[in-house]
Every structure is written in structure tokens, then in C-alpha cells.
Amino acid sequence: MARRNFKVLYVSGEVSPFVRISALADFMASFPQALEEEGFEARIMMPKYGTINDRKFRLHDVLRLSDIEVNLRDKTELLHVKVTALPSSKIQTYFLYNEKYFKRNGLFTDVHNGGDLKGNTEKVIFFNVGVLETLQRLGWKPDIIHCHDWYAGLLPLLLKTVYASNSFFSDVKTVLTVHNVYRQGILPFKVFQKLLPEEVSSALYRAGDNVNMLYTGAEHADLLTTTSRLYADEIVGNGSDTYGLGTVVEERKSTFHGILNGIDTRQWNPSTDKLIKKRYAADRLEGKLDNKKALLDEAGLPFTEGRPLAGIIIGFDAFQGAELLKESLVKLVELDMQLIICGSGDKEYEKYFQDFAAEYPEQVSVRTDYADTLLHLAIAGFDMLLMPGRIESCGMLQLFAMSYGTIPVAYAGGGIVETIDAVTDKSGSGFLFYDYTADAFAGKVQEALDLYHDEERWLQLVLEAMGKDFSWKNSAGEYDQLYRKLLEE
């Protein structure tokens, strides 16, 4: 058991159920709790987006955390903080708010080409500096600041430059976890140069006229992790396919660790889940059909006895598989199944999928406004979960799915291979396709459908999937050891 006076601050741009952009939000919903159970005192900081409902999540103002000054070189912006507990826990979650940056601009927008869509650059600088200013006003000094993805990539550098002489942050260590190597926060250098001291802007990792936020974080964090061993192996030394990130990770591979994701089995357990239509378990599976009927009704699709229901939950961008899905849809609807697509993101993809669904009103439904309640019902109601994303560091959705007896069909990349046992004649927990093409994807779905109609074999597959242990127990123990080793250095 770790010493209880060890404190860890988790910093992320998304945390479920407050806001979900990607699987990172699901990770953040359970990972801090798992580490707190190892004996660490955990807290979370994230932006207070205008889309977050204060009343629903019981956010309240903290008077002593009002009007915090955030100095952006030639100007000062004020920061206000709200707080609530992470649901089903006592973990304090702090929401950093400034009307200019977060009321209308909303979520951080992933930028790959150096653009500054929705003012990302100034927003992310404000957020990173604001985290450190909030800690000082709060008077809570963490032993470790654990940064997640590019949103928090500036923190390690700030601590080693402008905050290095600040006694409040003496001996504070930083960890950066890479959840998605393709989301790196490529933003224009000129904005950093305008808003940050020269000692910071000169140390940023630059690619031409742009700054790479994730690369900058990877250069300066004390420890690097990602969410599976295989994904770590894919990144190391792979400079060309990782926009250069593999190069810095190769240089720092002694401090780079792949640790598999887990899930909170108290929140994600079909026998106790309060967010689904009817609870069920491996020894009483009839409840799963009730969830399927409820989901179809919610999606506006008819129920037909024996007809399989497949689901897709992705962000509408090429990195999460929207392009492959677009290329595959005609092939998929030719198969005898129904399809529910849950996602949001690129408006062109969104329109395409909605227009496509309109052509098949009894077979395809698209939801762009799904909330946590629908996510649970979807995982319980799907017969299979289709995962067209090319790269998954580990992913969380397939872990949720298998725990609920929903069979994944996924591309064999990254941590997916570590979590899904490919179906063979005798065993398995899911289906993997190895060629990233529409034909291979649709072909594997057809293979899954063939097995679905073999009731005895499908039941065996469902029971094997539900019998797997995806709890945080082992992975939390690995992080416990890494944290303690880092703090001893």
C-alpha cells in the first residue's frame, strides 16, 4: 500500500460523465479512483466547458478560488473554479472556467495542421497556466501531476522553466500519458511566443511555424506512459507514422512504459448497472434482450426476432475510423443486421451518416447527442460492437462491451490485440481484422454474423467474453510501483 500522503493531480481535457470526446474520458472516469484505492490522494482538474450542466453534476463555486490571475505575458485573464465530486467517488474534480475561453468556444478542437480553430492555442495556454495558479491558491501541493494527452502537454515544461524557482512546486514530478499518438495538438508558434515568456517559448518543440504540444510534453515530463505494451512498442522508434513522436520516445524509452487500461467494474457491471433497462449476468442472460429492445425503441428502429444489432461508437474523424466506416456502410447494410451509429465530430461525416440513415430508416440509426445513460444502454443492447478505428492505444469500449456480453469486431492494432482473444474454432472473445480495408472489415462482420446464428457457439463466445477480468487491479498496481519509484528518485 502506498503512503497516503502521496498526492496525485490528474489533468485532462475530458472526463466522463462531464464531457466525452474520446475514450480518454472513460479512462479518466475510473483511473484516478483505482489509484486512490492504492493509497494515493487523487484530485482532477479539467476545463469548465459551456456544455457542462452545473445543476446536473452539482458543480458549485469555491469563493477562495475566484478571480485567480493568469498572466499571459502582456495581459492578465481571470480564472474561476467550480468543484464537484467525481460520481460514485469522493475524488474532488475542479473545473477551470473563463467565459472568454470556454463559454462559447466549447471543447478543445483537435488540430493536425497548425491551424488555430476556435482559438485553441490561447485556450490551451490559459488552461495549463491556470492549473498551476489554481494549485497555489488552493494550497494543495501534489507530489505528482499526471498529464493526459496534448491538452496538458505544456505543464511539464512550465514546471521546469517559469515555475522552477517557485518553492511551492519544489520536487513535484510529472507524468505524461499518451492515449492517442495521432492527436498531438499542432498549434501556431506565434501565439505561444506572444503569450509566454521567452524561456518557455524557446523550449517548445517546433515543426516549422508550429508547436507540437504532445511532443513538448514528452520531452519534458519525468515519466512517460501509454495504455498498452503493444502500443508502446508500436510508438518507440516509429518517427514517420507518429509525426515524430516515436523519435523522442525512442530517446527516452527507459522512462516509457505501456500499462494496459482497466475499467471500473462497479460502474460497468450488467448485474448492478442502474443505467440500463434490465440488469443481467452470465447466468441470466435474458435481460440482455430487454436492453436490445429498449435501445432499438430509443433509436427508432423496429425489433425483429433473431435479427442481430451492431453498434458503432466513435468520434467522427478519420483517426477513429469514420472514413473506413463511410467506405463500408453500403457493404454493411447489405448484411442482414441493424446498425446504430453513436458519435460526433466532423460535420461532413455527421451529415453523411445521417443522410445515409435516412435512406434505411428501419435498418440504420445515427445518434450524435448520446449521453452516459445511452452509452450504458447501447453497450448492453448491442449484440456486437464494431470498432473501425485504425489505431487504438488500448481503448475502453471493447472492455465495456465484453463485460456486457457484447462481442467486439475490431482492427488488430495497438492494445486491441492485448484485450481481445480472436475467435477460433474452440474459443475467443471477439473478432479481429488485419487488413485495413472496407472489404476486410465487412468480411469480418459477416464472419461474426455467421457465428451469431449458431446459438450454441455464440452463447459460448458471450460467456467467455463476460468471464474476462478487466478490472484496474493489476494495472493500478503497476502505476503504484511507477509512482513510488519516481518519487524516490
Curated annotation (Swiss-Prot):
ADP-alpha-D-glucose binds at R20. InterPro entries: Glyco_trans_1, GS/SS, Starch_synth_cat_dom. GO terms for biological process: glycogen biosynthetic process. Pathway: Glycan biosynthesis; glycogen biosynthesis. SUPFAM superfamilies: UDP-Glycosyltransferase/glycogen phosphorylase. It catalyses: [(1->4)-alpha-D-glucosyl](n) + ADP-alpha-D-glucose = [(1->4)-alpha-D-glucosyl](n+1) + ADP + H(+). CDD domains: GT5_Glycogen_synthase_DULL1-like (cd03791). It is an enzyme of class 2 (transferase). Keywords: Glycogen biosynthesis, Glycosyltransferase, Transferase. Synthesizes alpha-1,4-glucan chains using ADP-glucose. PANTHER family: ALPHA AMYLASE DOMAIN-CONTAINING PROTEIN, GRANULE-BOUND STARCH SYNTHASE 1, CHLOROPLASTIC/AMYLOPLASTIC. This is Glycogen synthase.
